[in-house]
């Protein structure tokens, strides 16, 4: 098990038990699990997590940026919509015809 993983799990155990996260407590847990961790790594993790509520971080995470919204207003005529569709089809054909010679099996 890597040092980072062991310290992360130890921090989660402490947070779940509602115990303050400190470098000594992180080292105690990792030593109990027979995972060798240098003191500096425990200090870094303890300082990074100081004042953080891990339960809130785990529960209230964001999955990333929202997808862009579609066009709200539609085109008022059928001809304009057809022209745009044809234009998109032409662009797709042009892109597919571009052979730069970088094929996988060339």
From Swiss-Prot:
GO terms for molecular function: protein kinase activator activity; ribonucleoprotein complex binding; structural constituent of ribosome. N-terminally acetylated by acetyltransferase NatA. It is found in: Cytoplasm. InterPro entries: P1/P2_N_sf, Ribosomal_P1/P2. Residues 73-106 are annotated as: Disordered. The keyword Phosphoprotein applies. Gene3D superfamilies: 1.10.10.1410. One of its GO terms (cellular component) is cytosolic large ribosomal subunit. Residues 81-100 have a biased composition (Acidic residues). Keywords: Acetylation, Cytoplasm, Phosphoprotein, Ribonucleoprotein, Ribosomal protein. Its main location: cytoplasm. Pfam families: Ribosomal_60s. The modification Phosphoserine is found at residue 96. The keyword Acetylation applies. One of its GO terms (biological process) is cytoplasmic translation. The modification N-acetylserine is found at residue 2. Component of the ribosome, a large ribonucleoprotein complex responsible for the synthesis of proteins in the cell. The small ribosomal subunit (SSU) binds messenger RNAs (mRNAs) and translates the encoded message by selecting cognate aminoacyl-transfer RNA (tRNA) molecules. The large subunit (LSU) contains the ribosomal catalytic site termed the peptidyl transferase center (PTC), which catalyzes the formation of peptide bonds, thereby polymerizing the amino acids delivered by tRNAs into a polypeptide chain. The 4 small acidic ribosomal P-proteins from yeast can be classified into two couples of similar but not identical sequences. Each couple (P1A/P1B and P2A/P2B) is distinctly related to one of the two acidic ribosomal P-proteins P1/P2 present in multicellular organisms. PANTHER family: 60S ACIDIC RIBOSOMAL PROTEIN P1, LARGE RIBOSOMAL SUBUNIT PROTEIN P1. Component of the large ribosomal subunit (LSU). Mature yeast ribosomes consist of a small (40S) and a large (60S) subunit. The 40S small subunit contains 1 molecule of ribosomal RNA (18S rRNA) and 33 different proteins (encoded by 57 genes). The large 60S subunit contains 3 rRNA molecules (25S, 5.8S and 5S rRNA) and 46 different proteins (encoded by 81 genes). The 5 acidic ribosomal P-proteins form the stalk structure of the 60S subunit. They are organized as a pentameric complex in which uL10/P0 interacts with 2 heterodimers, P1A-P2B and P1B-P2A. Belongs to the eukaryotic ribosomal protein P1/P2 family. This is Large ribosomal subunit protein P1A. It comes from Saccharomyces cerevisiae (strain ATCC 204508 / S288c) (Baker's yeast).
């Amino acid at each position: 098990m890597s040092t980072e993983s062991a310290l992360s799990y130890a921090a989660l155990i402490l947070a779940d038990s509602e115990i303050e996260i400190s470098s000594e407590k992180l080292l105690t847990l990792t030593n109990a699990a027979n995972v060798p961790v240098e003191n500096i790594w425990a200090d870094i993790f303890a300082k990074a997590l100081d004042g953080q509520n891990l339960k809130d971080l785990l529960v209230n995470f964001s999955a990333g940026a929202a997808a862009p919204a579609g066009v709200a207003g539609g085109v008022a005529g059928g001809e304009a919509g057809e022209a745009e569709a044809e234009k998109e089809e032409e662009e797709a054909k042009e892109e597919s015809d571009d052979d730069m010679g970088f094929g996988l099996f060339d």
